[in-house]
A protein has these predicted regions:
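Phosphate-/polyanion-interacting regions in eukaryotic proteins
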Residues: 62
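Exported/periplasmic ABC-transporter solute-binding proteins
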Residues: 1-46, 53-57, 65-66, 70-74, ...
């Protein structure tokens, strides 16, 4: 992507914490970072896997563990460099300023989804789980209108602009999104906790810089920003 920098391909779920942390990393390490976004999983040219396959240059990927597992299987990752960074549960977003719905129980979630004219979900890891696991388990697939968006940001934009009544997605993509409010987490019985991980890309031209970046993101120094973005870090805070 860019010469003279550590090139990162990142999915939306970890982006809020990442953006908060990069100025400190660049300042303390002297390493410049260049960032490009992509989806953890799914179809289309903007998934991280598709970008790597067509030759987009990257040193580090940050994405869901499910998406990273696919990259590892495709030999796109330097063996042994993958590190788990954070866990994030799924939550519900509604248009800012509207009454927050009851999301405290499975039945409340089911009522909310059946009432919604349109439900926005990301096309990536969480959306795949919602469409193939949760919605069928609730027995509502044939009764709801699901709009899968290429990125989580598109899902919150749909809700903010009135194109969807609710979005179900990682909490980290809701808390700082413009035009939406966080209504709450999915109940524990139907929760999906997503893990975001990082790894060095095979063929990286700066393995040292890439490794230092991942070590920083996995360290206790990054924990506060990760928590503020709605995730739970794997690292223990100082």
């Amino acid at each position: 992507m860019w010469s003279g920098a550590v090139n990162v391909l990142i999915s939306g779920g970890f982006s809020s914490a990442y953006e908060q942390l990069m100025p400190e990393f660049e300042r303390t390490s002297g390493i410049k970072v260049a960032t490009r976004s992509g989806a953890s999983q799914g179809a289309g040219p903007q998934t991280i896997a598709a970008q790597l396959a067509r030759g987009v240059s990257a040193d580090v990927v940050i994405l869901s563990r499910e998406g990273l597992s696919e990259l590892i299987a495709a030999n796109m990752i330097v063996a042994g460099t993958d590190v788990n960074l954070a866990r994030v549960p799924l939550g519900v977003a509604v248009r800012a300023g509207t009454p927050k719905p009851d999301v405290s129980s499975v039945e409340a979630i089911k009522r909310l989804l059946l009432k919604a004219k349109t439900i926005a979900v990301p096309e990536s890891t969480s959306g795949i789980w919602l469409k193939t696991d949760l919605f069928p388990r609730l027995g509502i697939v044939e009764e709801i209108n699901i709009k899968a968006t290429p990125r989580g940001t598109h899902a919150t934009e749909m809700v903010a602009e009135g194109g969807a009544d609710v979005a179900v997605m990682p909490v980290s993509e809701i808390l700082h999104a413009t035009g939406v409010d966080f209504a709450g987490h999915l109940p524990p019985e139907i929760q999906f906790v997503q893990v975001f991980s990082a790894a060095v890309v095979a063929g990286s031209g700066d393995i040292d810089g890439a490794t230092r970046l991942i070590e920083f993101l996995a360290s206790a120094r990054a924990s506060e920003a990760i928590r503020k973005s709605g995730m739970e870090p794997f690292a223990t805070s100082n």
